[in-house]
A protein has these predicted regions:
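Short loop/turn segments that connect beta-strands within beta-propeller blades
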Residues: 64-68, 109-113, 149-153, 194-198, ...
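Extracytoplasmic beta-rich repeat domains
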Residues: 25-45, 69-90, 115-133, 155-178, ...
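Structural signature of WD-repeat beta-propellers
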Residues: 48, 55-56, 100-101, 140-141, ...
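Loop/turn-rich, solvent-exposed surfaces of beta-rich toroidal or solenoidal domains
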Residues: 263-280, 286, 290-329
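Blade/loop signatures of beta-propeller domains
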Residues: 1-29
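C-terminal closing repeat unit and adjoining cap/tail of repeat-based domains
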Residues: 284, 315-316, 321-369
């Protein structure tokens, strides 16, 4: 199953990367410390050989390959900077789209960092951003999906789903396929809408059998689409496969995971909250293999360690954890071959770009060959 090719980001199906680096530490891209880093899921933007990220005051920084700053752009007032906005980023050719945790969203010219337009929303944002043709999509903390124009930030349509008083710390997910947009909300609903007008196609409340109080603690993985089937899991011991056309349940199995699964060929790879690597058959949902990859952690510390995210390389799986470690796992055996200390606290999931691996800390991005 390791011969599958990587797919585009509209379906969140990264598959397998042709990466076999030796993980030699090469560069640190440094920025001022992000205080609420551990509560969020940061993602950099790669543009040609450069990297774009932000600091604690919301300043966007474009670094070149030698870690020199090409430009710095901050579009916040003194008061807004004190709120320490967390930024969600996406790019469309030479335009950088930003939505943040203090209800602002705006667009920059990636080449020079100049502001193109800026807008305000009634609620803060808490999802990945997806760009499709001349539009971009993002979900706010009120569980409302917005469709905006890339050109001027004008709202084209929005769709509100059921909301709760308690806001989820887990970033919400969006996927797009065949002019249909799918997204989850903080209480486990998965909704399918027409991309052009926002008309409802179907909606599935996945937590219908769980009492309301329990739904407030829900954390779900990203949605992943593969061949008309949507896959995702949550911390309520549920892994779902839904038919994208109808929302009908294809299968469900008991797996406790909140990180994005990878689909490679006929296999699904995921990692549970307590550190087990699981490979499933994507057609039936049957478990093919389970391997303990937290076995090298001491028992007392293990219960406090959780997976953050992983990528699949040519021969290895690279997994980061909440205690700042990078685990290198052999694909064939599922065994944990090596643990590298990156930091003493939570780090981001790994990112691979142009055969280099990147990991974000609260005040730097580390690049490995």
């Amino acid at each position: 199953f390791i011969n599958s090719k990587r797919k585009n980001n509209l379906d969140n199906n990264a598959g397998r990367h042709d990466f076999g680096g030796e993980l030699i530490k090469k560069l640190n891209y440094k920025f001022s410390k992000i205080s609420n880093f551990h509560q969020n899921e940061p993602k950099p933007i790669f543009f040609e050989n450069d990297l774009i990220f932000f600091d604690k005051k919301g300043s966007l920084i474009r670094f070149n390959e030698s870690k020199k700053k090409v430009w710095i752009s901050n579009n916040y007032t003194k008061t807004e900077k004190k709120s320490k906005p967390f930024l969600y980023l996406a790019k469309n050719q030479n335009i950088l789209i930003v939505a943040d945790s203090i209800s602002k969203f705006y667009a920059l010219n990636i080449i020079n960092g100049d502001l193109i337009w800026t807008k305000n929303n009634s609620s803060s944002f808490n999802s990945e951003i997806k760009i499709y043709k001349d539009k971009f999509f993002v979900t706010d903390s009120q569980n409302t999906l917005h469709c905006f124009s890339i050109k001027d930030g004008r709202e084209i349509w929005s769709h509100k789903t059921e909301n709760t008083l308690i806001k989820s710390e887990k970033k919400l997910s969006i996927i797009i396929n065949n002019n249909v947009i799918y997204f989850n909300n903080s209480i486990g609903d998965v909704t399918a809408l027409d991309v052009q007008k926002g008309n409802l196609i179907w909606q599935l409340p996945t937590l219908r059998n769980i009492i309301y109080a329990e739904s407030l603690s829900l954390k779900s993985s990203d949605l992943v689409l593969d061949k008309k089937i949507i896959y995702f899991s949550n911390n309520k011991n549920e892994f779902y496969a839904l038919e994208a056309n109808s929302g009908i349940l294809r299968w469900k199995t008991k797996i406790n995971s909140v990180i994005r699964p990878k689909i490679i060929g006929n296999a699904i790879i995921t990692i549970t909250q307590n550190g087990f690597l699981i490979i499933l058959d994507k057609v039936s949902g049957n478990i093919i293999r389970i391997t303990d990859i937290f076995d090298k952690f001491k028992e007392k510390k293990r219960v406090q360690i959780y997976p953050v995210g992983f990528v699949v390389g040519a021969k290895k799986i690279y997994l980061t954890t909440t205690n700042g470690r990078l685990l290198i796992i052999d694909i064939k055996t599922g065994k944990n071959e090596k643990i590298m200390k990156i930091d003493g606290d939570k780090i981001s999931k790994p990112f691979i770009n142009k055969n280099k691996l990147f990991i974000i800390k609260d005040k730097a991005i580390i690049r490995f060959n």
